Each structure stands twice: as C-alpha cells, then as structure tokens.
Amino acid sequence: MNTNRRKKGRKKKDVETMTAPEPFSPAAVKQLTARVPEVQRALLDNLDAFPQYPETPLLKAGDQYEGIWLEHNQDNFFLADYAPESAWGSQDAFLRFQREDGLFPFALPLNYRKEGNFFYGYDRCFWHVQTVWPFARCAMEIARKTGRPEEDFARIYRGAAAYDSWFVHHRCEAESGLPAMYCEYDTGHDNSPRVTDGGIPHSCPGDDANNMPDLPEMPILSVDLSAALYGGRIALAELADLLGKNAEAAEWRAKAEMTRLAIRRYLYDEEDEFYYDRATTGFRKYRTEHVTRLFLNRVLTQEEFDRVYERYFCTPGREFLPPYPLPSVSIDDPSFRHGIRNSWGGNTQALTSLRALFWMGYYHRGTDREALLLRWMKAFEEHPESTFQQELDPFTGAPIGDGVNYTPTLLLFLEAAKLPQFTSGRPV
C-alpha cells in the first residue's frame, strides 16, 4: 500500500551517498562469519523468563537493561527469524499490561521482585512514553511474520487505538494536534542536550507519563513523538483494512494526514531544511538523530526526504556522516558531545542503525543501507575487544562502555553477515 503519496511512474533508482569501507580480506571474512553461530547464541541467551509473564521467555535489551522496553520492540521483528513465539510474546505482554486509560508501559522489568533493584516493586512502568517505532506497526508486522490468527490483529487494533486516544487526551496540544515531550526519557535520548536543557527531568513528575513538568518551555511539541503518532495512525488504517473496517480505515488515514500537515507546519524550519521540536518560546534547534524517526515512520515524501538527507547525511566528515555514520547528534552541531558513555549526545547508537534498516530501502537508499551495515562490520573487525556494546565512537568505531551483548548490536552483526560478501559458500 502506498502510504507516502508517491507519484506513479518509473521506479526511482537507489542513490549511493554513504561510502562503504574498503573490501574485507578473505581472512577477515572468514573470521567474522565464523562468529555467526556465537552471535546467534548470544541473541537467544538474551531471552529470559519473566515472573509477570510466564508463558514464554521474552527478549531483553541486553545485560544492562534487564527487561523489555517499548522502544526496543523492533528488536522482536528480527528475533522472529530465530524465536517466533518469544517475538510475539512481547506483543502479547504489552497488550496484557496496557493501562486502563490506554497507555502502554514503557518497560516490563525482569527483576522487580529483587530488593535493591532500580525497578523494585514495579512489574510494569508508566513513568514516561519512550516510543519510537509505533506499537501498532511493530506488532502488526510481527503478527504477519509469525502467522498469528485474525483475533490477534483485532487485539492489536484495539490496543493501538486506545494508545492513540491516550496521546490525544494527555499529550496532544490543542492548536496543532501534535504530541508534547514532557521528559528526557520520553524519546529514549538519554543524556542528549535536546531533551535535558532547561531543567527537563528524566521521567515525568510523580512517575506518571500523564504529568507535565512545571517549566516555562512546556509543552514542547516533539518531532519524534509526532512521527510515531503519524506512523501509528497509518498502521491503524492498515489494521482496519485487514479487519474489514473500511470506514474506520478512512478515518485513521484522515487523522494521519492531519498529523503530517501539522508536522510540516509547526516543526519544519525552511531555512535550515530541518525539523525541530517547538517550545512555547519557539524552535529548539538541536540537530539530532530524531529526524531519522520521521524517516522511520515514512512521514516525508520522497522529495522532502531527499532535501533533508542530501543536506545532512551525504557529505563525508560532516553532520551525520562521520566514518561510523548516524551519530546521535550531528558532529557539526554545537551541542555535540564526544566520548561520554551511554550518551545520545554524540555517540553512534546501534538502535539508530538498526531502525535505519527499515527506512533506507523505502527511500531508495539501499546502497547506503548496505554501506551502513558494512561500517558496523568494519568496527567489529577492527575492534576485537568489542563485547557488542550499545554504541560506537563515531570517528574510530571503537566500542564505548562495558556492556555485553546489547541486542540491537547483535542484530546488526547478524544482518550484516547476510550480505553477499559474507554469505558466499555458506547458508544464510
């Protein structure tokens, strides 16, 4: 289905702008491909039994994130190739623990019964939103991939519609209809100046995502939450189509179009050709990877995408194209911070790159998709000390932090290992 209003005609060819690293030597190819079984085992070792959901093991984000996170839900799309019941289990768990007002938990912690644990006493958490790839889209694609019955698509539809309603009633600003960001973790951008400057708290007041902090700039209309709202509405329209709810499908598409137009009207800076959050005082001009979430949710037309991408993602050594691409903040932005652990203030994040696999091909950047995966593979080759941490130095590819087997990083390795130069002579 055409959800991005492309004109009919000859298919646009892929455009190459992201340079792939030098070819891997035969020895490097052999060394890297030999690790595939080990990495697959590490991925499956991240499955764990959750006391609040005993039906099937669920996929943790990694050793330093012992739980399932809503912002990590796309990890389950890839997991479905290895453990389909567990991939669906996370969707079922989020639906089961959805709050009565429609809010999904941002996390289901694993060790909530353990005294001294950060999440002690919380088997589900509603402290902030932390949504990126909409639940409606992710759950629907996983349900398709794992062959779920129609009743599960109906559950997804009901749950996602209630979630949309929660946003409308608790986060969407009246004039624009766009959702506001209330706290740092709403968007998952830990330690990014974009979501901390001005005294913005980590979580919402009272540990409840309904509550807006009493700050002069609030509410702050959020680019990425607006993108997720749009993407969720397009997915809801597709679900309604599947369920034979044609009138409701049309309503969701109309709502999505209103969101798309509002994003353009309120959040786009024509001079900068960039999308910014808008506070009561005006644009908050941080050039961060939040713009890729417009790509992820296919908010932009091809022409709009090309304008942003070619200005900010196509010049080597500038903006979002350092040697290890897609840093969390443009390397030319004054707020860029280098070398800080667990920082969306500058480091190249595995989550950003994993999500890019969903949008690069759609926007005719398939060659860049391959080049991005090869850059990650080059980092694994050149830094054998890597334990599959969550982030890289954008200039050297060196792993940052001491985490082990972060799920998105494992998945990037496995996806890169499917590229032709690594699959010759072995089954995928």
Regions found by a protein language model. Name each.
Residues 79, 138-141, 232, 239, ...:
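Core register positions within helices of long alpha-helical scaffolds
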